[in-house]
Amino acid sequence: TEPFILFLPRYIGLQPEDQRAIEILLDAAEHIGNWSGVIEDWYDYQRDAFHSFQIGSKVVRKETRDLYELGEHFRFILMALAAHRVSGEQRYLDWSIRYGRKRAERILLREEIPLLWDLSGNPVDEAEIQRLGIQSLANSQHHKLGNPLGGIENLLSSGAVYAFGDLYRLSGDQIFKSAARQIVAPLVGTLSDPYNEPAAAALSYYRSTFSDESLDSEILLQIESFPTNPPDELALLFPQIYAIREGGVGKRADMVRWGEWTEDGIIKPIQEPSPATFTLAFQVTGNPLYAERALKNASTRLMM
């Protein structure tokens, strides 16, 4: 799905006269709501859910292990909205609002966001995922076992907060704001995590898109715990063994690590918050020192 939600919409924005690019995007998007008429249906309008996780232009696989709704299905909202922007066809927007509203309702049904849902909208917990052997559907390779933010990470990685933001702007329906807040509110407690870029970025987006500063007092408490000064020198580390070693969001087994190089040649785990976190701190406080620290932090990492 990445070419259709990341590359093509941006490319078409730069090259709006490229009809071939538009045709490719619309050719994919027409399957989302069963509009093509030449392949098996992807979407179940009775349950407002996709028929499967494994769907394509040739096969819609309906084996038992495929009958779940994941964070990845949010990507079809982003694709349909992109199709609406380039074509002006109302069906793409209507479907996006309909499906987005149903996903929002399911998110709001319980306090903790599950790793995935069955096709009737029931959450599937981690113990059941282990029993069924469907860890790959839950993206278990990207979060530690028992991580309470695992479900949120799955939604972040598929752009759920950004999809809800688009739907809120287009419809004004408060349910999209409520669902987005349900996703981002638990992330405030991760702001001191040096690897939490997706969390800080989502909080920043939520705060501006929904004009909601209700989390600011909690964010300020986190900011107060930040190190007073940045490290003198960073170190870039490549662990020998690929593994998820921390909780929270934004971790990969194969990611590089950052360390703080001390004068005596010892490398300590980095304590400096991420550039995205300092950007959020600047937005909340208006203190330009946080903006300066974000830019310096980011430029140093890019240089390395």
Write out the residue ranges for each language-model feature.
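Glycan-recognition and catalytic cores of secretory/periplasmic carbohydrate-active enzymes
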Residues: T1-M304
